Design a protein with these regions (language model features):
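Beta-strand elements of well-folded, non-transmembrane domains
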Residues: 123-127, 143
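A short, structured loop/turn motif at beta-sheet edges
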Residues: 107-115, 143-149
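A solvent-exposed, acidic/Ser-Thr-rich amphipathic alpha-helical stretch
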Residues: 34-39, 55-113, 120-122, 131-134
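Hydrophobic h-region of N-terminal signal peptides that target proteins for export
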Residues: 13-23
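Short, low-complexity N-terminal intrinsically disordered segments enriched in polar/charged residues
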Residues: 8, 21-65
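Short beta-strand edge/turn micro-motifs at domain boundaries
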Residues: 136-160
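Bacterial N-terminal signal peptides that target proteins for export
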Residues: 1-10
């Protein structure tokens, strides 16, 4: 009788532990559309290739003219101010590199507009071929499908 009670209690404890572990874990991200996810990841790569190389003419083609860039420290910037900010970084801080943390990126479609991309990235200093002094920050990009291709219309950059 005592042995049966111990087995039952152990079974209940084991079952409740497995139940808690199974149902308390968040589900891993799975893109709604793999094609959309891959497209936005490619555009993100091209955007920051331009930023990291200081190619401002290329970089500004990734933004809509009505861009709103919200930065938790810098405040709100429009298209012209954003391009000026990137130009200043390219001129005065050309050693700055953006490094995307790919596993942090999620892309969700917004009906009749385009996707929202969220993720985490680092900005680092390139010194003698090594990335040092990296800061890790979060971002939200709202992409819009335009006649000229995918462009970012809204940016939220935070966690600085």
């Amino acid at each position: 009788m005592k042995k049966t009670l111990i087995i039952k209690l152990f079974s209940i404890l084991l079952f409740s532990s497995v139940w808690t572990i199974f149902f308390s874990q968040s589900k891993p991200y799975v893109p709604v559309s793999k094609q959309l996810y891959d497209t936005i990841m490619e555009k993100d790569s091209l955007l920051f290739d331009a930023a990291n190389s200081g190619n401002i003419d290329k970089l500004k083609t990734f933004f809509t003219q009505d861009l709103e860039f919200f930065h938790d420290v810098g405040g709100l910037a429009n298209y012209e101010e954003t391009v000026d900010n990137f130009s200043r970084v390219a001129k005065n801080y050309s050693y700055t590199r953006r490094v995307l943390i790919p596993e942090s990126v999620e892309v969700y479609p917004i009906k009749d507009y385009g996707p929202v991309q969220t993720g985490t990235h680092q900005f680092c200093r390139l010194d003698k071929g090594s990335l040092i002094n990296c800061g890790t920050f979060k971002f939200v990009h709202i992409w819009k499908k335009t006649p000229d291709g995918w462009k970012i219309s809204r940016v939220v950059s935070y966690g600085h």
